[in-house]
Regions:
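Binuclear metal-dependent hydrolase catalytic cores
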Residues: 1-62, 66, 128-147
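Binuclear metal-ion centers of metallo-dependent hydrolases, dominated by the metallo-beta-lactamase
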Residues: 69-81, 86-147
Length: 147
């Protein structure tokens, strides 16, 4: 991810003649402690690119992904809250679709799950009626989640 970002957005990381660098890459360890938070990175596949999600205590945020390996899934047990990619209804090569998203939620089995990163065809109210579990909800702008 770092290599890809630096290649695509070189000007943000390296001083240019008329443009100073504005970002510095901070590489996270697999496990970190920030104050009273245990932060763990979760490796996921986003098409051919590897990206990461985050587990923070009993909360996880996994936005852009197509596949989570079994070893990484094990790290996501006993979650209170999961925010997970749910791009669209039809299959996509770099994101999980609705059915795949629900399968991952079933495997991870969090107390509550929120769907994010939704394509414009994912109407909030229609999506809510398609979800048969009251502990799974689509995200919306301005949503506040108590963790």
């Amino acid at each position: 991810t770092e290599r890809s970002l630096k290649k695509m957005f070189k000007y943000l990381f390296i001083n240019q003649k008329n443009y100073p660098a504005v970002l510095k890459a901070n590489i996270l360890k697999k496990k970190s402690k920030i104050k009273n938070l245990n932060v763990e990175t979760i490796k996921v596949s986003h098409g051919t690119m590897q990206t990461i999600g985050f587990k923070i205590n009993k909360f996880a945020y996994i936005p852009d992904f197509k596949k989570i390996e079994k070893t990484e899934l094990k790290k996501l047990k006993n979650l209170d809250v999961l925010i997970i990619d749910c791009f669209r209804y039809r299959p996509h090569n770099t994101h999980v679709n609705f059915d795949e998203c629900l399968e991952y939620i079933k495997l991870i089995n969090p107390k509550r799950a929120y769907l994010t990163n939704m394509y414009h065809e994912m109407d909030y109210f229609k999506l809510k009626t398609k979800i048969k579990n009251k502990n799974i909800l689509p995200c919306y702008d301005g949503l506040k989640i108590k963790i």
